[in-house]
Amino acid sequence: GLVQYVMGRLPQNEVIEDAIRKEVKLVPEVVIRELLANALIHQDFELTGTSPMVEVYADRVEISNPGEPIVPVDRFIDGYQSRNERLADLMRRFGICEEKSSGIDRVIEAAEFLQLPAPDFLVEHQRTVAVIYGAKDFKLMDRSDRVRACYQHCVLQWVLRRKMTNQTL
């Protein structure tokens, strides 16, 4: 399907684990799946001449959909409001996505687990854009990357009812 099509176009690296060569994609499949589902569910069908879009670059993937979000981008982790509730319900029934308000949480958890830079969520020209970055050395991350990672980690811990400490960060 669509997820496999996008995964097949992502840049990849080879790593050696336990003496076995393994191909690693720029970003994990769970991230692509959740962001594609969000782009489809939350698009504004009233805007004409535009549709969800996936752009693949050497260092990042940008998945966008038409329309400005109903919830501010800094509340994507803990807020939920869909403009297409019937479509969201249908996609949950078909197993394309899970319960409400869990997709962005999964994206951020996957990025943290794999030590990827924190995803960025933007609103540009009546489009909502999710940017997920490939691996980046901590020394090369700028201040905004680090602040975004701290903020998202803090909110995610709160949503999951976990304590945030220096060790969890």
Per-region residue spans from a language model:
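C-terminal regulatory or interaction extensions
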Residues: 1-168
